[in-house]
Curated annotation (Swiss-Prot):
Full protein name: Phage tubulin-like protein
Marked site (GTP hydrolysis) residue numbers: 187, 190
Pfam family, one: TubZ_C_2
EC number: 3.6.5.-
Organism name: Pseudomonas phage 201phi2-1
């Protein structure tokens, strides 16, 4: 029998978020290219490091050929599950490669999954990785004929990394609640059809899509052009249909479920949200590049008449 849910964390960001969810124990699987992000609390979860790597240094091109051949072995450590949650940074070097490669393998398994991704906004280098990783996910969606559903959290400047990790962990717990198979009127196939909506509606073009997680009907209604919608209610009398989704299902949470913290939660998937994500990333990179173009290029301090030998020594 497959387990209900498996959580996969890749790269430094994934490893950090995993520290907030170690209480989930055996359900948590962490992957990285070096041991520098491994801390004591990771001992209670599954951690696998790639062989022959010492980190990526933010360079996706360098790490890709080193880890790609190892993906089948990594996947062998991941159990069969009814639902998978993947978490990584778009802008790093390790997670932005491991995450999409694992995602592609999950698609081949015909698995149901969503990803939580962090947009790294710290530098033009990170932003370039953000763009390339999003394009990678779009290519995977097309190649695998499956929507790749992501919840995107931008790492905006001035915000602490810890607060971002907390936000992602809280959202992940809501998805874990969604797929715990403890809700009335909601079965495993309802969840699968929600996230893999092109299986049933194959006229829709598989693309990267955005997952919105809202705890009020008003906020859920404000998600534009909702494609697929799944709602949980604690009180069934509060259920009200809204929007114009192609797919909609409802689950009724149980009062005695200790994981329930909200009286309603809405999980809404759309495609147009990705347009705004890409615009934000691209505009941020252009603005940062514009500011960098103003940097002063100083004159060299070596004079033409300096005696410089073949080792660069000035004597």
């Amino acid at each position: 029998m497959p387990v209900k849910v498996c959580l996969i964390f890749a790269g430094g960001t994934g490893m950090n978020v995993a520290t907030k969810l170690v209480d989930l124990g055996e359900a948590v699987h962490c992957f990285d290219t070096c041991d520098k992000n491994v801390v004591d609390v990771h001992r209670s979860v599954n951690v696998t490091l790639t062989k022959g790597t010492r980190g990526a240094g933010g360079n996706r091109k360098v790490i890709l050929p080193l880890v790609r051949p190892q993906i089948p072995a990594l996947m062998d450590t991941i159990p069969e599950a009814d639902f998978y949650i993947v978490c990584y940074s778009l802008g790093g070097g390790s997670g932005s490669v491991l995450g999409p490669l694992i995602t592609g393998q999950l698609a081949d398994r015909k698995a149901s999954f969503v990803s939580f991704v962090v947009g790294a906004m710290e530098s033009t280098d990170n932003l370039g990785n953000d763009i390339d990783t999003m394009k990678t996910l779009e290519a995977i969606a097309v190649n695998k004929h499956l929507p790749i559903v992501v919840n995107y959290v931008p790492n905006t400047q001035g915000r602490s990394y810890e607060s971002i990790n907390d936000e992602i962990a809280e959202k992940i717990r809501k998805v874990v609640l969604l797929v715990n198979q403890n809700h009335g009127r909601l079965d495993v196939h309802d969840v699968a059809n929600w996230v893999r909506f092109t299986d049933k509606h194959n006229y829709l073009i598989p693309q990267v899509c955005e997952l919105h997680i809202e705890t009020t009907r008003k906020d859920a209604e404000n998600v534009p052009e909702a494609i697929s919608q799944l709602s949980l209610y604690l009180d069934p009398s509060k259920e009200v249909a809204f929007g114009t989704p192609i797919y909609r299902k409802v689950g009724i949470m149980k009062v005695d479920d200790l994981d329930v913290t909200d009286d309603q939660i809405h999980f809404v998937i759309n495609s147009v949200g990705v347009v705004e994500i890409m615009k934000t990333i691209t505009d941020s990179k252009l603005e940062m590049t514009r500011q960098q173009s103003k940097f002063t290029q100083r004159n060299p301090i070596i004079d033409a008449d300096d005696n410089v030998d073949e080792d660069g020594m000035v004597v």
